Amino acid sequence: MAEPAGFDVDIVPVDVQMQRNQHYDVFMLEHDYVGAFAIGFSLNDPWIQDFKVSHTPAVLFDNYIIGNPSTAYVGIDNDEGMELAVSYLARLGHRKIAYLSSSLGSQILQIRHAAFLRAMHQHGLNTTSSSTGCSYYLSECMEKHLPRFLEKGMTAIICSQDTLANAALIQCQQLGYKVPEDISIIGFDDIPIAAYTSPPLTTVRQDRLELGKSGFFALSSLLNSISISTFLLHAQLIERKSTGEVPVT
């Protein structure tokens, strides 16, 4: 949408060293960029601080900046998405639902974690420290948290990302558990691989094309001095084969 509208679009990889060497506004000015769609920043990245005071329009996909009219956030309604996942599992009879996440270093992962706790509370389902697990490394999630969930008799696991859900699915199978007969697994994002895991992954979809369009609309608004704060899309639960009714004991 941006190119047909007359914009030149560059895809620019950004690492931490680059952010330390040059502030966001300076980088944008030197390269004659009028705005940016920023993806994949962690809360500790230097430019996150820049986005709080920047005058150059920026639309962030996975972080929300408070108080700067030059920035906007686009994404799905994660509260809605987590509610869809929890209510779906509850209808299948699951009461012992765990939540597995990679490091809470990005705001979107913090939002999803909090959304899980709220959704569980709304359905009258208990959560404890033993029913949630967060680690930076995928391997640590599999070695530290997943076995604990299984030992505690969890019958379903919601994962913060599809890649994590796929790893959990494979690990459960290697430990002798059948998915979904013994344990149900739900992912988040609906990346292309989700439809081709074994079994195919039930997940919460965020439509990448619609997110791209939303990012363009938000950035266009900022460039025209329309101060958009958030632009949320509805979440959608994609039911596949990694979830089933609670196992009979």
Regions found by a protein language model. Give the residues of each.
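An alpha-beta-alpha
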Residues: E83-H123, T230-T243
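Hydrophobic alpha-helical segments within soluble ligand-binding/sensing domains
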Residues: V74-Y99, A114, R118, L138-P147, ...
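Short acidic/polar active-site loop segments enriched in Thr and Asp
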Residues: V34, R95-I97, T155
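Flexible loop/turn connectors
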Residues: E143-T249
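Short beta-strand elements in bilobed, periplasmic/extracellular small-molecule ligand-binding domains
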Residues: A2-V14, L117-S139
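Short acidic capping loops at alpha-helix termini that bridge into adjacent secondary structure
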Residues: R95-K96, T127-S130, V179-S184
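Alpha-helix capping/helix-boundary segments
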Residues: L43-N44, L104-G105, R112, T163-A165
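Alpha-helical recognition/docking segments in bacterial nutrient-uptake
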Residues: M1-S87, P147, K152
